[in-house]
Amino acid sequence: MTFLESIFSQLNKSATEPVLQEIHHEKVHSVTGNELLAIIQQARHFLVARGLKKGDRCALLAPNSIRWAALDLALMAEGIVVVPLYARQAPAELVAMMRDSTPSRIFCLDAAVAAEIKKLWPQAPQISLLEGVYAGEPSTPTPPMHHEDGDVISIIYTSGTSGEPKGVVLTAGNVNHIVSATNSRLDKLMGPRTEADRIFHYAPFCFAASWILLLTALSRHSILALSTDLAKLSDELKLAAPEYFLNVPTLLERVRARIQTTVQERGGLATAIFPRAQQAFVRRHNKQSKFGDSLWLALGNSLMFPAIRKSIGPNLKALICGSAPLAIDTQLFFMMLGIPVLQVYGLTETTAICTADDPAHVEPGFVGPAIPGVEMKRADDGEILVRGPNIFSEYWQRPAETAKALQDGWFHTGDQGEPNENGNWRITGRIKNLIILNSGHNIAPEPIEEKLAQHLPEAQQVVLIGNQRGFLAALVTSNGANGANKLTDQQIQSAIETVNASQPHYKQVRAFHIVPEPFTMESGLLTTMGKLKRDAITQRFAAEIEALYQKKSS
């Protein structure tokens, strides 16, 4: 049975039970298995009536919603290749990806976005608004088309080191394996039970990991609640009351910071107990416990931790974290509160996942062992190589880049890492220049650096930083001796604002630091070809970079 057949089967089993939810205006709106099948069928009728057929490609440009999920399933059920796009992406970038993938039709939520696409791409294919897709009369649901393992299911765009997004081609075989493996891990985490597991979800479905969670949740006995307003995430969590929550490091770090600030503001006994309990927990993890640690932990567990857990989510049993490595102290923080944090690791090219924590053997700071059926090894330079049925088939219309990434059956991830004696992997850095923010967004620095340099003729070099951080920042070097006097904060800020105006939110530069002297070969910060030695630069200016982020976050 394919992943799609499993989903349709589970929806039939959950005919009268809620399977998907949206949160709007402090109310939870649910659809049952039967209701979701019905709107999927409406969408399928729309597709067939427009002459769309197996192998065609369609772009799906909308924020998360029940209708997004239904259209995605309808497209796949008809054998149509889905090209999901990020709704908050700059219109010019969206058009570039659609020109590359040549969709037969574009599905869009917003008429204003549709108009912008037509303005930038007058020859664009027909654009259909989601509202019109579901205007038809309901009819009896029919089974999905059967997919062979080699059938293309989706093309998901991911940033490359050149800055030009590449379409990652994923097949039915890729998704079949990952959904099965993810279900296996979730079975260990959630265990057998008669009631549906409640899962909360906010990351855009155009991200591979987010999409895989959607498919996995629909293929099992669960209720997936979708966030619709990030500004109200805390309130939505209380309404959904989930047991499990997929998130990224940035969010967990914000929650941690908010809790610590709240404790500090309370004063009194709380400010005495909490930091000491936290230090005691870290020492216990490191097997360095001191006399009195048990007392501080007991006080924390009896007087503080239960209330904090309830404020995060009264029913929360575990957090699942991916998209970027999670700081070990943040993972330990939530474990101290009694909320396990499981990590997963993967890329779009690995169909989102290649490692996942075993709930019974979580090691903080590690992302778990390879999932069943997937092989991983460490190359001589420390790069992580992956092989298995989850590996993408190709980069869309990029044979040279495909050949470079896939060598002798092994996918070269561009990440550095190492396994421990238990087979759990630790991610240690990036081989490539690609910056991965804590939000999980992948950003090629070169195009943004080039644009900033164009607006800063006084600068010698511009270097973007932000790997495993919450936002981008820049190091800007002055042009020539005593150049610090020629390059002002106002000039840099003006250039940043100009460039930011054409960038999506996650590609915007939020802070900068002026370096008085240019980087040179002699200083060890440029190669003999004049290229930036990024690792050396970030190491040399580690203190300045840390101060930059601390100042911006305070």
Question: What role is predicted for each listed range?
Answer:
Residues 176-198, 205-302, 315:
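Conserved AMP-binding/adenylation subdomain of ANL enzymes
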